[in-house]
From Swiss-Prot:
High-level lineage: Bacteria, Bacillati, Actinomycetota, Actinomycetes, Bifidobacteriales
E.C. number: 2.7.7.27
Catalytic activity: alpha-D-glucose 1-phosphate + ATP + H(+) = ADP-alpha-D-glucose + diphosphate
Residues at which alpha-D-glucose 1-phosphate binds: Y100, G165, E182, K183, S200
Membrane-traversing stretches: none
Molecular functions (GO terms): ATP binding; glucose-1-phosphate adenylyltransferase activity
Protein name in the entry: Glucose-1-phosphate adenylyltransferase
């Protein structure tokens, strides 16, 4: 059992390739994908950990990690004199001539770092979800329950069970896990709601010695994917040593009734798009403006956004939108969209229901609808994106089954 006031080391699993987010992950790791105008996905778990009081953090990176490493190094600077740090740790082939074989193997390959720190408890979190969470509350329950390993759980629709680890709770001990299935094709719903499951959020708390033992056994096993959800969580569940933390009980200062216990997986283009649309209503599903639990980032030394021209049909304006620093809307129109820094929207152009990454330029009379434009995309005069699916596909753009067009980084759209 972990002691009270334990020493905590946090590990962020940031080595994911993010193939379902292509082409947004063509040139960057999934946790480095921009989100919400000025953030990157990695900012959400790191902000949650730091706001929880946990400031000894290592970030395990692997896939196309340059921009991610640079972002962490520039933003997350702590005073090492106080023993605080957020350190990116790339895959190092420390235990063999292979890269990370899975999330569990990634943690196992950092055992030397864990041994140097000598924590009582290890907090392990993913790097690609959008949410606020006080991890101290989860750690406190972990200690009180006597579990060796605790999984954070959230209710999700049963039809999404194949996307998550599914938790069955022990009815006699509601804080303990009876069974854990990773992405089952079929499962049963919860006793109080057969249309829902209790899904793993990919966040774990573990006693260090027990975690070492499980990872060591897993490293030698043959029938394993070396995965935290698929292998380590079931390992503890089978031994009646796994607890579950109900995320709906997590209380965040400044949270509203609307965004209490908000959590989104943004692993697909549609999920990524929908999570952005959650940000921009009058009472947003997820409130970026809660300064009692801030999401930290750095948008550089940029000037304020500017809107110019106000004559006839040439009016620079934005409605129901997030507009970031450095943006100039010069006689163009933006509606229901998220606009990242240094974007230019020129006269008589229109941007609707879209997400624009940094340094995008929308020239005169160009139109964008229901699209995601990666960094440095340029639309020439009179060009369009998102108005004709067949035309978008013919130009090599990604178009989802529900009509969201994605334009890769650096593309010049000239027709």
């Amino acid at each position: 059992m972990a002691k009270k006031n334990p020493k905590i080391l946090s590990i962020v699993l940031a080595g994911g390739e993010g193939t379902r987010l292509m082409p947004l992950t063509r040139d960057r790791a999934k946790p480095a994908v921009p989100f919400g105008g000025v953030y990157r996905l990695i900012d959400f778990p790191l902000s949650n950990l730091v706001n929880s009081g946990y400031s000894q953090v290592i970030v395990l990176t692997q896939y196309k990690s340059h921009s991610l490493d640079r972002h962490i190094s520039q933003l997350w600077r702590f005073s090492t004199l106080l023993g605080n740090y957020v350190s990116p740790v790339p895959a190092q082939q420390r235990l063999g001539k292979h890269w990370y074989l899975g999330s569990a193997d990634a943690v196992y390959q950092t055992i030397n770092i864990i041994e140097d720190v000598q924590p009582d408890i290890v907090v392990i979190v993913g790097a690609d979800h959008v949410y606020r969470m006080d991890f101290e509350q989860m750690v406190n329950q972990h200690i009180e329950s006597g579990a060796e390993f605790t999984v954070a759980g959230i209710r999700q629709p049963i039809e999404q069970s194949s996307q998550f680890g599914v938790i069955e709770v022990d009815p006699e001990h509601p804080n303990m896990i009876k069974s854990f299935q990773e992405k089952p094709k079929e499962t049963t719903g919860l006793p109080d709601n057969p249309n829902e499951i209790l899904a793993s959020m990919g966040n774990y708390v573990a006693n260090t010695d027990a975690l070492f033992n499980a990872l060591s056994i897993d490293s030698k096993a043959e029938n394993t994917k070396h995965d935290m959800g698929g292998d380590i969580a079931p390992f503890f569940a089978e031994r009646n040593e796994a607890g579950v933390y109900d995320f709906s009980r997590n209380e965040i200062p400044g949270a509203t009734t609307t965004d209490h216990a908000y959590w989104r997986d943004v692993g697909t283009i549609r999920q990524f798009y929908d999570a952005h649309m959650d940000l921009i209503s009058y009472i947003p599903e997820f409130n970026l403006y809660n300064m009692e639990w801030p999401i930290y980032t750095s948008s550089g030394n940029l000037p304020p956004a500017k809107f110019v021209h106000a004559a006839g049909d040439r009016i620079g304006h934005a409605t129901d939108s997030i507009v970031s620093p450095g943006v100039i809307v010069s006689g163009g129109e933006i509606h229901h969209s998220v606009i990242s820094p240094n974007v230019r929207v020129h006269s008589w152009s229109q941007v609707n229901d879209s997400i624009l990454f940094d340094n995008v330029e929308i020239n005169r009379r160009a139109r964008v609808n229901r699209a995601i434009l990666d960094k440095n995309v340029v639309l020439t005069e009179n060009s369009t994106v998102g108005l004709d699916v067949e035309h978008d596909l013919a130009r090599g753009f990604t178009v989802t089954s529900d009509g969201i067009t994605v334009v890769p980084k650096g593309t010049v759209v000239d027709d």
